[in-house]
Amino acid sequence: MKLFNTMNIDKFDRVAFIGGLLATIITSTGMFLMGHISGLEAKDLITSSLPRLNTFFNTVVLGSATILTLLLTLTNISSGSKSTLKETYYKRILKIAKLDASVFIVSVITFLLMNNPLIEADSIDMKYYSYLYYVWSSISSIVCGAIVAVIIMLY
């Protein structure tokens, strides 16, 4: 916890960071173990996990877009009201919006890249499928941790 104190991170950000980090570690460990324990070749792993990863990134895109829309609505409603809100309120919303926008952008780009028919290409060396599986697994684990952090920040 000394690390967080030296970086001037408040409790709000610390809890979200720890929750996101735990989600990233758990999902990446699970995908790493699945890659080693299953006994499948990398191309088969990609083929079997691709529909689920597409669904995951599609869901994250929809969820993060909804959160951004609701945050925008919230700021418009609060700025139009006669009550005055604290500056920290708007700073918290801005932090959430920045992280959520990053999650949205990474998810959209990854979702589009995953829909390229690389699996059906015969000229690709088999060792690249292993790299591709671990890259997609790493990106999905990081996005999972980031969306968990956004949800914790909303709480």
Regions found by a protein language model. Give the residues of each.
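Transmembrane alpha-helix detector for multi-pass membrane proteins
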Residues: L50-N116
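Membrane-interface helix-loop-helix modules in multi-pass inner-membrane proteins
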Residues: V103-I139
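Hydrophobic core of alpha-helical transmembrane segments in multi-pass integral membrane proteins
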Residues: I18-L33, I105-I109, V143-V148
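Alpha-helical transmembrane segments and their helix-start/interface "positive-inside/aromatic belt" motifs
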Residues: K2-T24, Y90-D100
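Alpha-helical membrane-embedded segments
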Residues: Y133-Y155
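N-terminal intrinsically disordered, cationic/polar leader segments
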Residues: L3-F17, G30-N54, L62, Y155
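Membrane-helix interface motif
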Residues: G30-D44, D100, T110-D122
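Membrane-interface interhelical loops and short amphipathic "cap" helices
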Residues: L40-F56, L85, L118-Y131
